[in-house]
Amino acid sequence: LVVPPGTPAGVYNITYKLCEKLNPLNCDTAIAKVTVDPSPIIASPDVFSNIVAGTTPNPVGNALTNDKVNGQPATLGTNGNATIGPITPATPIGGGPVPTLDPLTGGVTVPPSTPAGAYTITYTLCEKLNPSNCASTQITVNVNAPTIVAGNDTMPATNGATGGTPVVNALSNDSINSLPAVTTGATPNTTLVVKTLATALQVGKPVPSLSAAGVVTVLAGTPAGNYTIVYTLCDAVNPTNCKDATV
């Protein structure tokens, strides 16, 4: 008895007749019962760590890398040996986007602006030849908050009598995820909040101010002297990811 490759799992009955060679009419009939088992499936958990969401989709790996069907690497597509069945998507954090699993390729992707945190995707890996032969496992994606650099600034001197705006912006040496910090416009990646106002050198006189766009303004009539403003620069996606700096 031979079981060809690609035979679906199940019970097969083969009826055959055995006859005596010397007396060909002396025969008996029997049934050979063949049980074909489904292939063993190994769907192993996956963990992708130290991932940072960027401004474009970030492919972090493939869920099938450590999965096997009948001892062979699990593969998808026309000539593959497996399919990805039902997927339970990750739970959003703060209503933001979540990592995704592509059922056609097994690729795991972290979309732009995905909040920092741990995400779990559950998926089912099934044998292509026997679609009901499946195993489930989980993918864990640990997304880190991007690094914020908030550099201290020393503004060029401004005439306090007439006032004005220094040509240097407080955000000029600040960055998030190695990209320039932007607090305004259609796609800001950070927020700027003044933490400590400048202290007046004379009672009732104006002091320099700092806007949410990083612009320092010196009002006319500001007494000469050195002023310090402390501000906090925060990640627009992860509001608790912040750094302080001074102007």
Where are the regions that the model predicts?
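Extracellular/luminal low-complexity segments enriched in Ser/Thr/Pro
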Residues: 1-9, 107-116, 215-224
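Surface-exposed or secretory-pathway low-complexity segments enriched in glycine-proline
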Residues: 56-107, 164-217
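Extracellular interdomain linkers/hinges and stalk-like, low-complexity segments
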Residues: 14-17, 22-74, 121-124, 128-185, ...
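Glycine-centered loop/turn motifs
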Residues: 10, 53-55, 117, 160, ...
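N-terminal regions of proteins, emphasizing targeting and processing segments when present
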Residues: 91, 112, 147, 198, ...
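Hydrophobic beta-strand residues in large extracellular and virion-surface proteins
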Residues: 1, 14, 32-36, 84, ...
